[in-house]
Amino acid sequence: MVRVAINGFGRIGRLVLRIALSRPNVEVVAINDPFISVDYAAYMFKYDSTHGRFAGEVSHDENSLIIDGKKVLVFQERDPATLPWGEHNVDIAIDSTGVFKELDSAQKHIDAGAKKVVITAPSSTAPMFVVGVNEDKYNGETIVSNASCTTNCLAPLAKVVNNAFGIEEGLMSTIHSITATQKTVDGPSQKDWRGGRTASGNIIPSSTGAAKAVGKVLPELQGKLTGMAFRVPTVDVSVVDLTVKLAKEATYDEIKAVIKKASENELKGILGYTEDAVVSSDFLGDTNSSIFDAAAGIQLSPKFVKLVTWYDNEYGYSTRVVDLVELVAKN
């Protein structure tokens, strides 16, 4: 049994808790969020506009959530270094704040007594692991990153295609649902002017490091992929459009067959496959990192192809966070 604490009780933090509660080997002992009181944490956990009401019983006392009779301590500390992780024998701290995402800042959880840290965001300093892609390279590192939801979607598909046909170069667009950093109406956003525009009424071009990050988890693709994002007014579920130049000639049917085989074997549960006439809402709550849409892709020539793959950027990603926690706990 691995004892876990969650720092940051936002979209990912709350879903990670839901998923962890279904895993017999994971016990969440505490959550921390300086902006959320205990009663409000109970309310936010119980009701979710996107994923629906929590199926179990949720209540609270002065300093704990009580979920199906089990207590989870709630803290409201701004500085993770002051958290009592040692006192509560925390094995792994999950940092889902989006703030403490580098080695030096995530170290605060170690200073507080946690044995290891899993960061739920891409990191420029912590090693990144994508389950299904490079988790076999995990070698006991103390602080690790689960990369981004988009990297988790793109990397399994890129790995399969590259192994079978070789990728010479590629461009990715993610058509991405709105997230918490966006604005309900036009507002100040000094670092990203477009990002400050009304989320519900615009298609907003944005930058993403997700494609370049694939090169960190798959070194053979370093420098071969880059990409961008379009933020669109849907609440959840996003889709990656990957256009690649292949090293070997292939038919679209051959490409589909290779991806389907991987989805049924080594990447089962990570990479899904569908030939149905699906739309984004069909993937709400899907636990795969990536679901290849065989009917949506197109091919121009034997070496030039566009591949389309869906992901629940909240639920699929949060599922992988818990997978990575279990992996780190074993090693």
UniProtKB/Swiss-Prot annotation:
The active site is at residue 149. CDD domains: GAPDH_I_C, GAPDH_I_N. GO terms for molecular function: glyceraldehyde-3-phosphate dehydrogenase (NAD+) (phosphorylating) activity; NAD binding; NADP binding. Keywords: Cytoplasm, Glycolysis, NAD, Oxidoreductase. The record marks 176 as: Activates thiol group during catalysis. It comes from the Eukaryota. GO terms for biological process: glucose metabolic process; glycolytic process. It catalyses: D-glyceraldehyde 3-phosphate + phosphate + NAD(+) = (2R)-3-phospho-glyceroyl phosphate + NADH + H(+). It holds the Pfam family Gp_dh_C. Pathway: Carbohydrate degradation; glycolysis; pyruvate from D-glyceraldehyde 3-phosphate: step 1/5. It is an enzyme of class 1 (oxidoreductase). D-glyceraldehyde 3-phosphate binds at residues 148-150, 179, 208-209, 231. InterPro entries: GlycerAld/Erythrose_P_DH, GlycerAld_3-P_DH_AS, GlycerAld_3-P_DH_cat, GlycerAld_3-P_DH_NAD(P)-bd, Glyceraldehyde-3-P_DH_1, NAD(P)-bd_dom_sf. GO terms for cellular component: cytosol; external encapsulating structure. Its EC number is 1.2.1.12. It is found in: Cytoplasm. NAD(+) binds at residues 11-12, 33, 78, 313. PROSITE patterns: GAPDH. Homotetramer. Belongs to the glyceraldehyde-3-phosphate dehydrogenase family. This is Glyceraldehyde-3-phosphate dehydrogenase 2. It comes from Kluyveromyces lactis (strain ATCC 8585 / CBS 2359 / DSM 70799 / NBRC 1267 / NRRL Y-1140 / WM37) (Yeast).
